[in-house]
Amino acid sequence: MSAILSADDLNDFISPGVACIKPVETLPKNESSNSQNPYEVTTEDKVQPENLPPAQISLTDCLACSGCVTSAEAVLISLQSHAEVLNTLDAYPELPLTQNHNGPYTGSSDALDGESRIFVASVSPQVRASLAATYGISEKEATYMIDQFLSGPHGLRAGGKHGSGFSWVVDTNVMRDAILVLTADEVSETLKEPSARAISKDTLPKRPVLSSACPGWICYAEKTHPFVLPHLSRLKSPQALTGTFLKTVLSKALGVPPSRVWHLAIMPCFDKKLEASREELTDVSWSPLDGGVPLTESNKPVRDVDCVITTRELLTLASSRGISLPTLPLKSLAPSYTPHFPDETLNAFLFRKQNGSEQSMEAGTSGGYLHHVLKTFQAKNPGSEIVTQRGRNADVVEYSLMSPGGEPLMKAARYYGFRNIQNLVRKLKPARVSRLPGARVPAASAGGNRRQPISRNSASAGSGTDFAYVEVMACPGGCTNGGGQIRIEDAREASTSTQSVTAVENPSKPTPHEQRAWLARVDEAYFSAESDAEGEMDGQAQPLTIPEREARVHEAFEYWSNLMNIPLSKLVYTTYREVESDVGKPKDAPIDTTRVVELAGKIGGGW
């Protein structure tokens, strides 16, 4: 936050100003006139407007602005909090589900009452790792703790106005594994010759393909470096894809509109709240069209993710209900609290046993996108070897897949943290055309656009464009170091055991060394999921190979698409757009009429 702004200066209302692009005109109030003269004439410039309600700026408005980003987002992010979760649980009773041999279903009277809701939640593995490190338990036990809190009889269901809880708690690793397969497919298509591609070049990202799962990185790119947008992977993040999956399947199977399915996501960073507010991630993007209009119950878009809270906010949610997380049973829920998913095929896909293959140290703490791409291409090139080269710091790593003959087959990289991201962006930035008289104009720039890349799906002249894929995350150290994770000072307060955290007896501010040690503890808990999964797999089927995982994902997603009668591209892909700023433009400058009309026509704000 800049030196001019501080948290003390902010309140729950931000008045439209010169640095805000929301098209709200501020007019003087209409003052009542005591004049009784029926012949009084008022000139046009003296006509006073009607008194209008106060202007409101929503989070989606501020996401469309590169002016007062920090202050506005800091205020409006707080609208998605533990308080919203409690208010929603108290405002709506839980929709009763009746179980039979075909799975759960709703009675016709219950489905039409309009008041009840189906509550579902999704949890990221980084959240479980943070809880495991805080309470000195395993990652699997942290899973049980969350399930008991959200769905069990001693958790949220034990209190509140209606005793509502969450019918299903989903692991985002399921959709992450699916996205890993689709990411490898996407990168593979970009490396093919244009004539051999199965996907249109207009829907493919340019090389190098940049990961798009981190909302902090996406927001930064859209606002400050729009020239990298063609490089972004078109795939949704695990959070967004989980939301689309749950809203589509549950609304279809249970016969309720998507607005009756309330989806809570528990994530490691605050930027996930921004992602959930994107208009591209609502039912408008996937609803079937009726004469060009989405088939929704109202004109208001329904988010795929209704609310996002962080790991720390999960602790606050528990304390607000007077629930002590460490006292909850660390065991799986009784069958009466775990209804089957409405569709048997998708139930097997969504709640399968995890093999933990992408939570290894080699894959990293951010989902293993780069690791899976490399392993997929290595499997297609027997005898090849992955060579690693460290960068200036631990958050920059470059990889080369070398053939048995020592020739490079593909290159990839990992860039974590904004300091390193800025270096990556500089490498991708197209060369500017010289303005000097008589300067030679490159053929690719002769059309007049000085930032126009040489071609749509080929590498440009930057030194970083020889990569096929780059995993980009905003947080140094990856997603286990997200801004919403439990800090060491919070863990000291939350822990009930002196063995849980280092230096519990020392209440002073943690040193950098202690903070690094704490992050290493969280990373260790994150990686322990692999050993937990291996223990579950003992005596059972072996972990799936890469071709088996690919076939499983493609089969499940084809079934999902056919079930919903919606093209798969509308379910799994999203779009990005450049965010322009009006800051510094003169008031009499020409107005981008199209953009203003688009913004003005969206009640409650939008992208």
UniProtKB/Swiss-Prot annotation:
Keyword presence, 4Fe-4S: yes
Pfam families: Fe_hyd_lg_C
Binding site for [4Fe-4S] cluster 1: 20, 62, 65, 68
Record InterPro entries: Cytosolic_Fe-S_CAF, Fe_hydrogenase, Fe_hydrogenase_lsu_C
Residues bound to [4Fe-4S] cluster 2: 214, 269, 475, 479
GO biological process: iron-sulfur cluster assembly
Polar residues biased stretches: 29-40, 452-461, 494-505
Annotated keywords: 4Fe-4S, Iron, Iron-sulfur, Metal-binding
Classification via SUPFAM superfamilies: Fe-only hydrogenase (SSF53920)
GO molecular function, one term: metal ion binding
Coiled coil: none
Location of the region described as Disordered in the Swiss-Prot/TrEMBL record: 28-47, 439-461, 494-513
Family: Belongs to the NARF family.
Purpose: Component of the cytosolic Fe/S protein assembly machinery. Required for maturation of extramitochondrial Fe/S proteins. May play a role in the transfer of pre-assembled Fe/S clusters to target apoproteins.
Protein name: Cytosolic Fe-S cluster assembly factor nar1
Organism lineage: Eukaryota, Fungi, Dikarya, Ascomycota, Pezizomycotina
